[in-house]
């Protein structure tokens, strides 16, 4: 619903974003996410979330879009509020961290 930060992966050059999802469905819904952006993909707003999970406040309005909603690459907790991210390209940490992402959460 609300992409907050966006950047290119240093090795693959794919475009990635963090997303703060919608409110109003309880403390445990809807999970925020971190994902690569795919050309032509639909990520759900406002009809679905995290794949074909129909948004109850818009039930039955667009079953065609609900059915084709893309599941994000990394599902985070609800309301974690990732504010930024960076892909690590340094050599200070072990090699397994290289090209991985560090996510910055609010609070």
Predicted regions and their residues:
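Beta-propeller domain segments
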Residues: 2-107
């Amino acid at each position: 619903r609300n992409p907050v930060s966006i950047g290119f992966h240093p090795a693959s050059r794919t475009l990635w974003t963090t997303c703060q999802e919608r409110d109003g469905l309880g403390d445990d819904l809807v999970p925020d996410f971190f994902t690569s952006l795919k050309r032509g993909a639909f990520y759900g707003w406002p009809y679905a979330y995290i794949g074909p999970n129909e948004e109850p406040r818009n039930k039955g309005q667009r079953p065609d879009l609900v059915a084709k909603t893309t599941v994000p690459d990394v599902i985070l907790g609800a309301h974690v509020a990732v504010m930024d991210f960076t892909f690590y390209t340094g050599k200070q940490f072990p090699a397994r961290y290289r090209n991985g992402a560090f996510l910055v959460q609010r609070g």
